[in-house]
Amino acid sequence: MKLKKALITAAATLLLFGAAVEASAETPQGEPMTKKILQTAGRDVLGKMAPDFARYNDDILFGEVWNKQDALSVKQRSMITVVSLVSQGITDSSLKYHIQNAKNNGVTLEEMADTITQVAFYAGWPKAWAAFRLVKEVYEIQ
């Protein structure tokens, strides 16, 4: 379990070092896919030490999973990622990054607040409080 959390935290932390986005077309449902995720952080940070992990991070997680254009939009994927991190109790800089990413992908403050309120009942009240502190920073709420 600790290894799993460490790997998830490492993957999320890698995001802090170089996820880039570019404009894209639309989903199969005709909704705009606002961004395409491009990632080199895995190779930049861990390329020589853990080349397989770096490749999975850059090519699979970001190259395929985040860019999959089917039923989920990038906005929805961002919200799911925030919920996943909060539910695991990961409330460090990786969660802050993903809250910022969600905001950049169109998640409003109201949507973020409702999402964290919902997950609080299943993941725990203290985790939600910790997440809300980061939401206030990202959305610049006093």
Model-derived features: positions:
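Bacterial N-terminal signal peptides that target proteins for export
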Residues: 1-10
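Acidic, glycine/proline-rich low-complexity segments that act as flexible tails and inter-domain linkers
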Residues: 9-16, 21-75, 104, 128-142
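Short acidic alpha-helix initiation/capping motifs at coil-to-helix transition points
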Residues: 55-59, 89-95
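Aromatic- and histidine-enriched alpha-helix N-cap/loop-to-helix transition segments
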Residues: 74-78, 110, 123
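Short, structured motif recognition centered on aromatic/hydrophobic residues
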Residues: 76-85, 95, 115-116
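Short alpha-helix boundary/capping elements
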Residues: 84-91, 123-124
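Extended intrinsically disordered, low-complexity coil regions enriched in Ser, Thr, Gly, Ala
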Residues: 91-113, 128-139
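Substrate/cofactor-recognition hotspot
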Residues: 118-120, 124-129
